[in-house]
Amino acid sequence: MKDPSRSSTSPSIISEDVIINGHSHEDDNPFAEYMWMENEEEFNRQIEEELWEEEFIERCFQEMLEEEEEHEWFIPARDLPQTMDQIQDQFNDLVISDSSSLEDLVVKSNLNPNAKEFVPGVKYLNI
């Protein structure tokens, strides 16, 4: 059998579906739209903490930059020669030794000429 309240041709309005001014009838709290303010102090504290953290990080980066500027770091634009003349002067300052001085070096050497050649990554066992 059909429900008599639904058999009419006009749409029925059930009390649960009534919405007044954007709020359902069931809403018992008239201040529900202001409930977001309930945790406003916690929200403000969180935002303030994030701002302090950002400021701290910014200060750390600034201190790192100042520390780099204080030390004598290699700066290519400042430390490398700028002109070909400077490069040529550096080449002229280099001394090419003759082979006789190399032979003297070998004769005066304290190294063992019979030692095995060193190969990195290979372990040698004393047998």
Swiss-Prot record:
Residues 105-120 are annotated as: PABPC1-interacting motif-2 (PAM2). It is found in: Cytoplasm. Keywords: Cytoplasm, Translation regulation, Ubl conjugation. Residues 1-24 are annotated as: Disordered. Ubiquitinated, leading to its degradation by the proteasome. Coiled coil: none annotated. Residues 1-15 have a biased composition (Low complexity). Pfam families: PAM2. InterPro entries: PAIP2-like, PAM2_motif. Residues 22-75 are annotated as: PABPC1-interacting motif-1 (PAM1). GO terms for cellular component: cytoplasm. One of its GO terms (molecular function) is mRNA regulatory element binding translation repressor activity. One of its GO terms (biological process) is negative regulation of translational initiation. Its main location: cytoplasm. Belongs to the PAIP2 family. Acts as a repressor in the regulation of translation initiation of poly(A)-containing mRNAs. Its inhibitory activity on translation is mediated via its action on PABPC1. Displaces the interaction of PABPC1 with poly(A) RNA and competes with PAIP1 for binding to PABPC1. Its association with PABPC1 results in disruption of the cytoplasmic poly(A) RNP structure organization. Only the PABPC1-interacting motif-1 (PAM1) interferes with the binding of PABPC1 to poly(A) RNA and translation initiation. This is Polyadenylate-binding protein-interacting protein 2. It comes from Gallus gallus (Chicken).
